Amino acid sequence: MQTDNTKSNTNKTAKQEWGSFAFVICIALLIRILIMEPFTVPTGSMKATILENDYIFSTKYSYGYSNYSLSFFDFIPLFKGRIFAREPERGDIVVFRPPNDMNVRYIKRLIGLPGDKIQLIDDVIYINDKKIERTEVGTYISEEGIKYLKFKETLPNGRTYFSYKLAPIFGVIYNDRYGNTDVFYVPEGKYFFLGDNRDQSNDSRVNLGFVPFENFIAKAQFIWLSTKITWWDNDIGVINLVLKLKPWIESVRLNRIFRNLYSTDE
């Protein structure tokens, strides 16, 4: 009889533990789906605001919810448009699905709102025929030793941020077609994005085009971790992952941890 009671108590405890574990998993999934989601940035299109292998904390609720912003369900057409929608602001850094490749995620700065007229002339942004404030404030040398000119830009709503342009080499300007564009008329329900790394960004000036509001996933807020190298790789196997762990930890950029993406402090 004592043995049966012991088994019963053990089974009850195991069920309680599994129930608690399942509850925690459900809460974590709900947080990721509805509140926040971490992203890793693989490219330098937002350099030096965001570097390769920056780990970004983003808020899912900032713009409401669409089929594309609901993690794990974005492949199911649950509904169209957005629910609990909040209007994005000029200068926001947004994670979104590019309309020409729904299998990836981009992160760019929102420059043009629906109805805007956008053009770049000599690298200066013109919004509705008015140029934004743009001042050269210094230079930036990347980890690869590449020199960039650093500019402080101010949008019409007062949002300020830094943009970067490859420094001329022997007087030659790199990729000048990015700095002098056609006129873009932003359609209703769509937005115009630029990368802060102006010469090395696939954005609304080139292949990306305009981005529908429905494609917005989250608003990027701050960097919670940053490393010089990537650790996880599905192709290298468990042993190599273990061997790579130490150099990955040693590559952490301590000065970037918990950096606010909207701060213009030097």
Curated annotation (Swiss-Prot):
Its main location: membrane. It is a single-pass type II membrane protein. InterPro entries: LexA/Signal_pep-like_sf, Pept_S26A_signal_pept_1, Pept_S26A_signal_pept_1_CS, Pept_S26A_signal_pept_1_Lys-AS, Peptidase_S26. Residues 42-266 are periplasmic. The chain crosses the membrane at residues 21-41. SUPFAM superfamilies: LexA/Signal peptidase. This is Signal peptidase I. It comes from Rickettsia felis (strain ATCC VR-1525 / URRWXCal2). The lineage of its organism: Bacteria, Pseudomonadati, Pseudomonadota, Alphaproteobacteria, Rickettsiales.
